[in-house]
């Protein structure tokens, strides 16, 4: 810094002087020299420091010279050139085409998926050999020496796999196979049938029992340590030749004994717990008359056919038999591991189409599904089925998040059911079980918090800690599901939480992570074809590429608009057409919003041009002239403008006349006056900042925020773009998203604060005097910069929670307008996630986001 000071001061006061600096290096020291510089300048003049990019764009040339006191700032700067040149874009888009046959296939897939939603009943799932074996044990109720359900016994005989096991043939999970195989050979032995199948099953068991310890504990099905040892004991009584003395078997038996020792007998009957799911493994300790009191309304015990079959064989309870008949009527000759799964199926299907970015095709189906879930919502939480007496945090968190975002009235207090005295969250009440998938869903849920919801903040903290630890522990993946890339899902969720996760980017990511053959783990492995399905993935890929091709055409048109408007001649501003277009394309991506995207992009580009003009280029007199020209909409004033300002104004005038004409057609009334008024307010905010800068005035934090929430210009972009969202907007509706609305204020506030947190240091080094951090430090001179920055983040986080509430509850505003406001706030969180993603997009992740959203098709 001393060397730089010497280099500059030694040349004062004669003329303009230059010093080459590394880009952005040491610029924070620049303000320290102004007192020295000004000492040698002429009366009525001020020394100013100008920055411009040297050749190669890796150097900044600092130029010291005299300027009139009416200059708005002490710093005039040029910006790094735009990365997205036409030849770069052409190289990425030249081979990308969507075939007509793809569009036809999209229509077919949409129809087929709609039929899937419409046919949802109690839940589609696959056979469970384990549960079918238990149902097949039931003797005929008429007293004959036959099975009550002979079709289930026949299913076992016909569905043994080639290796001698029972279970799903396409996916091998040793724990699952050995459990199902043991259940089947016991049932066949009890009925004295299938000797060949029994022998093959025993051979499989012996082979796999030796290897099973190589499989991760996280792949052990729910209740395995309860039911497996109990069946081994039964097999031993039946004289089956199994390796009972293997270390693995002894270890599982010890786990069962330890678990039962910790279980108070009275808790089994006091309230419903997950033990109801495994009663077939607890037959020696269950009081069958007491347990009946915990039977579900549908006659089942926690929807488990195996558990329900065991209770029926012990009690003869008619409701148990009715439930089993009900299940077999649905599935024919077999049963699943649990049934119904109606809430689980609907919630996860909705989540799937939303994350894959294809939900717009299924609005009615989604509403029907969520209406169904909401009709069974319980303040204690929900489980996987409507008659489920034991709520779980997985389904509850998924339901809370999705229902809330769709406008249903649900309270976050429901999560308190799953929090223990230490503040930890678990899947089931009173248990210590939790897995990556359920904690991931709680984490996703926690980000749609409303103000004052401490339970959501606690859930966020707890789950983030758990998930980060899980990423470091390979064995943590996963207790409840075998997913294609759960690790990738977790990494995305932690890096791009709700307020940074734009729809197109989430869709792009989830297309890569989604597994059409994913399976879940209950007591046995099971599949959900209406959740994991190749059709979802195929549609998502085709639809993404189709939309992307439309976006590429729009971008080319917008880049031509920039050039034809003469903006390439403006050296004082940033050319960021591609990055700016990426914003609406990432959230208002649907084909019907093409005009909205174009207006959003053009308006945003003008906010950048005029921000740079008012911030660091024009004199106060020039800026007043420009503002007056906009206010009067008067071309006669143009001749008095400098050449570059003429280009700005003529482009501005022509563009917004065209936008106003299109708006008149869309809205059925003249909107030019409305658009001009929006801009007048915007330019007033720019002018105030220019005056502050010229006077070296640092306002109070509140004064700064009041103006800066407008000067960030998000409101201007949204208020004009809203005219093109496909809705006729009355004055009343416009007022609900207007300058005076809390919704718009929060969008501007959060956008300004996140911008300041990532740019205040660089801008301070360039001579800027006002930012949220600096203004708060002025109000509180006793605090450190770090403390001020922390305060700004706190204000922003609280405002984001309030923004959530406005977005969800502001139902008098059309959905497309609500989205426009809310998503504009979110895109700011993404752009300024790790730096100035607009000015320095080529140095941040925005560059890759642009590629993935606009240029790289999914394969």
Curated annotation (Swiss-Prot):
Gene3D superfamilies (UniProt xref): 1.50.10.160, Farnesyl Diphosphate Synthase, Terpene synthase, N-terminal domain
Inducing factors: Accumulates in apical leaders upon wounding in both resistant and susceptible to white pine weevil (Pissodes strobi) plants.
Entries under CDD domains matching the protein: Terpene_cyclase_plant_C1
Residues annotated for Mg(2+) 3 binding in this entry: 755, 763
Pathway: Secondary metabolite biosynthesis; terpenoid biosynthesis; Terpene metabolism; oleoresin biosynthesis
GO cellular component: chloroplast
Keyword Signal: no
Transit peptide: 1-52
Required cofactor names: Mg(2+); Mn(2+)
Uppermost EC category: lyase
GO biological process annotation, one example: diterpenoid biosynthetic process
Coiled-coil residue spans: none
Gene Ontology MF term list: abietadiene synthase activity; levopimaradiene synthase activity; lyase activity; magnesium ion binding; terpene synthase activity
Keywords for this protein: Chloroplast, Lyase, Magnesium, Metal-binding, Plastid, Transit peptide
Extent of the signal sequence: none
Function according to Swiss-Prot or TrEMBL: Terpene synthase (di-TPS) involved in the biosynthesis of diterpene natural products included in conifer oleoresin secretions and volatile emissions; these compounds contribute to biotic and abiotic stress defense against herbivores and pathogens. Catalyzes the conversion of (+)-copalyl diphosphate ((+)-CPP) to isopimaradiene.
Family designation: Belongs to the terpene synthase family. Tpsd subfamily.
UniProt domain comment: The Asp-Xaa-Asp-Asp (DXDD) motif is important for the catalytic activity in the class II active site relevant for the cyclization of GGPP. The Asp-Asp-Xaa-Xaa-Asp/Glu (DDXXD/E) motif is important for the catalytic activity in the class I active site, presumably through binding to Mg(2+).
Name of the protein: Bifunctional levopimaradiene synthase, chloroplastic
Organism, scientific name: Picea sitchensis
Taxonomic path: Eukaryota, Viridiplantae, Streptophyta, Embryophyta, Tracheophyta
Gene name tied to this protein: TPS-LAS
């Amino acid at each position: 810094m001393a060397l730089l000071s010497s280099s500059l001061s030694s040349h004062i006061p004669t003329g303009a002087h230059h010093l080459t600096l590394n880009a952005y290096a040491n610029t924070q020291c620049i303000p320290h020299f102004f007192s020295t510089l000004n000492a040698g300048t002429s009366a009525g003049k001020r020394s100013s420091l100008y920055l411009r990019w040297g050749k190669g764009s890796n150097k900044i040339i600092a130029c010291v010279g005299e300027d009139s006191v009416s200059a708005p700032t002490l710093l005039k700067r040029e910006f790094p050139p735009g990365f997205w040149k036409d030849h770069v874009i052409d190289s990425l888009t030249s081979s990308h085409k969507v075939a007509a046959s793809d569009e036809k296939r999209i229509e077919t897939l949409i129809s087929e998926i709609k039929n899937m939603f419409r046919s949802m009943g109690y839940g589609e799932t696959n056979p469970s050999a384990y549960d079918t074996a238990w149902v097949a044990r039931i003797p005929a109720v008429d007293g004959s020496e036959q099975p009550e359900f002979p079709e289930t016994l026949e299913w076992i005989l016909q569905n043994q796999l080639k290796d001698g096991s029972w279970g799903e043939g396409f996916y091998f999970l040793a724990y699952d196979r050995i459990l199902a195989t043991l259940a089947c050979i016991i049932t066949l032995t009890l009925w004295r049938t299938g000797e060949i199948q029994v022998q093959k099953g025993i051979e499989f068991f012996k082979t796999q029992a030796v290897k099973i310890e190589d499989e991760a504990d996280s792949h052990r099905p729910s209740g395995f340590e309860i039911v497996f040892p109990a069946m081994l004991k039964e097999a031993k009584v039946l004289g089956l030749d199994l390796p009972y003395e293997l270390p693995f078997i002894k270890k599982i038996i010890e786990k069962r004994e330890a678990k039962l020792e910790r279980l108070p007998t009275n808790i089994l009957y006091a309230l419903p717990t997950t033990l109801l799911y495994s009663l077939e493994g607890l037959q020696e300790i269950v009081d069958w008359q007491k347990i009946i009191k915990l039977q579900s309304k549908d006659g089942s015990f926690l929807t488990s056919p195996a558990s329900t079959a065991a209770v029926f064989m012990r009690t003869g309870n008619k409701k148990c038999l009715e439930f089993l008949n009900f299940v077999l009527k649905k599935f024919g000759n077999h049963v699943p591991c649990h049934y119904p799964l109606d809430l689980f199926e609907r919630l996860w299907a909705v989540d799937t189409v939303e994350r894959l970015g294809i939900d717009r095709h299924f609005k009615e189906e989604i509403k029907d599904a969520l209406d169904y879930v909401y009709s069974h919502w319980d303040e204690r939480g929900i489980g996987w089925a409507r008659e489920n007496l034991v709520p779980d945090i997985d389904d509850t968190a998924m339901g809370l998040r999705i229902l809330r975002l769709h406008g249903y009235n649900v309270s976050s207090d429901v999560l308190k059911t799953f929090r223990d005295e230490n503040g930890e969250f678990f899947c089931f009440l009173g248990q210590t079980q939790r897995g990556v998938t359920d904690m991931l869903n709680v984490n996703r849920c926690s980000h749609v918090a409303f103000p004052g919801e401490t339970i959501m903040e606690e859930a966020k903290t707890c789950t983030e800690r758990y998930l980060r630890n899980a990423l470091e522990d390979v064995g943590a993946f996963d207790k409840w599901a075998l997913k294609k890339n759960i690790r990738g899902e977790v990494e995305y969720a932690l890096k791009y939480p709700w307020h940074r996760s734009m729809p197109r980017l989430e869709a792009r990511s989830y297309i890569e992570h989604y597994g059409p053959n994913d399976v879940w783990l209950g007591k046995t492995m099971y599949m959900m074809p209406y959740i994991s399905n190749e059709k979802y993935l195929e549609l998502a890929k085709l639809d993404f590429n189709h939309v992307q091709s439309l976006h590429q055409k729009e971008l080319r048109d917008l880049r031509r608009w920039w050039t034809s408007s003469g903006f390439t001649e403006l050296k004082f501003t940033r050319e960021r057409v591609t990055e700016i277009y990426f914003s609406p394309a990432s959230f208002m991506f649907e084909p019907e919003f093409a005009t909205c995207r174009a207006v959003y992009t053009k308006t945003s580009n003008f906010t950048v041009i005029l921000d740079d003009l008012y911030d660091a280029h024009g004199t106060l007199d020039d800026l007043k002239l420009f503002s007056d020209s906009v206010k009067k909409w008067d071309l006669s004033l143009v001749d008095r403008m400098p050449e570059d300002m003429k280009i700005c104004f003529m482009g501005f005038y022509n563009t917004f006349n065209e936008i106003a004409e299109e708006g008149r057609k869309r809205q059925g009334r003249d909107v030019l006056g409305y658009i001009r008024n929006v801009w007048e307010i915007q330019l007033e905010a720019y002018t105030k900042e220019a005056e502050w800068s010229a006077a070296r005035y640092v306002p109070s934090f509140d004064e700064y925020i009041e103006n800066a929430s407008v000067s960030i210009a998000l409101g201007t972009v949204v208020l004009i773009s809203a005219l093109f969202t496909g809705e006729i907007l009355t004055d009343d509706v416009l007022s609900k998203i207007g300058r005076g609305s809390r919704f718009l204020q929060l969008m501007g506030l959060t956008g300004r604060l996140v911008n300041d947190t990532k740019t205040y240091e660089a801008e301070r080094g360039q001579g800027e005097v006002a930012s949220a951090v600096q203004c708060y430090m002025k109000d509180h001179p006793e605090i450190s910069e770090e403390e001020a920055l922390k305060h700004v983040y706190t204000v922003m986080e609280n405002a984001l929670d309030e923004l959530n509430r406005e977005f969800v509850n502001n139902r008098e505003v059309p959905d497309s307008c609500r989205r426009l406001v809310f998503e504009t706030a979110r895109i700011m969180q993404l752009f300024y996630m790790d730096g100035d993603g607009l000015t320095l997009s080529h140095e941040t992740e925005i560059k890759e986001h642009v590629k993935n959203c606009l240029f790289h098709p999914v394969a």
